Amino acid sequence: KKYLSIIFDPAFYINRNRLNLPSELLENGVIRSEINNLIINKYDLNCDIEPLSGVTAMFVANWNLLPAVAYFIGSQESRLINHSEMVISYYGGKISKQGEAAIRSGFWHLIAWKENISVGIYERINLLFNPIALEGNYTPVERNLSRLNEGMQY
């Protein structure tokens, strides 16, 4: 059920810096459905339903926490842990350049799982993040299951 919600209801989780709507609009089922269709069309999101792999199930189970997971993973790499900044960034506030770098690094670790997660989930990961935090050149990283598990358990 959560997987279907992620695929068909991106208005529920899209970062407020990507699309900031009054909550009253999302409470109306018809308007919410149209907003979801607009988001799906704007980002050309795949809506095929695929079997859940183990890694996809991990992403789905922790979906709304993936920005915090990314921050934790990136912070581990840079040896920076600042919980208050993680909370600020999660709610769409302004974060430091160092915090942005940590989020970006952690995001790269998440998308490194592209070949192991469903297309629909992969395409939607970036919608969870403040686009400013993702600016910059992509740096490929190797998949690291222990780091992913550690971030999700955190």
Predicted regions and their residues:
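General marker for long, soluble alpha-helical cores
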Residues: 1-154
